[in-house]
């Protein structure tokens, strides 16, 4: 399954990813076999892949396993592209551009995890 990770920086308006929750969430999803579509407007692809590789190495994964997991990552230039082929969307940084998306339409076909309380619950239903 492919999961969209929206936001890599530890907070909005920065490219600083040190200790970002997105790193840990993404690595755990990769270990569980997920593929990832990642988007952040300020953190570049190299930084994202380096963050993931560093944590996987620290967890003791071999080079072969690292390569397999890194191949399951797409870093995209738009959050809409990241969402497009994902079954679940995780908002992990509170970028203002995410506020304008029509989340109510998305949740009819995908699951949404809003880790930053960015979206009013009145704007979407999670189908409980």
Ranges and model annotations:
Residues 1-128:
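Structural/interface elements that position substrates and couple domains in central-metabolism enzymes
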């Amino acid at each position: 399954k492919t999961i969209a990770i929206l936001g890599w920086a530890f907070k909005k308006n920065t490219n600083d990813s040190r200790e970002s929750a997105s790193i840990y969430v993404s690595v755990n999803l990769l270990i569980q076999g997920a593929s990832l579509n990642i988007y952040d407007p300020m953190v570049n692809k190299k930084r994202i892949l380096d963050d993931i590789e560093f944590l996987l190495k620290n967890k003791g994964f071999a080079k072969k396993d690292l390569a397999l997991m890194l191949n399951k990552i797409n870093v995209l230039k738009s959050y809409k592209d990241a969402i497009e082929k994902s079954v679940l969307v995780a908002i992990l940084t509170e970028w203002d551009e995410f506020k304008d998306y029509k989340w109510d339409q998305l949740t009819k076909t995908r699951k949404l995890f809003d880790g930053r309380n960015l979206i009013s619950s009145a704007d979407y239903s999670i189908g409980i």
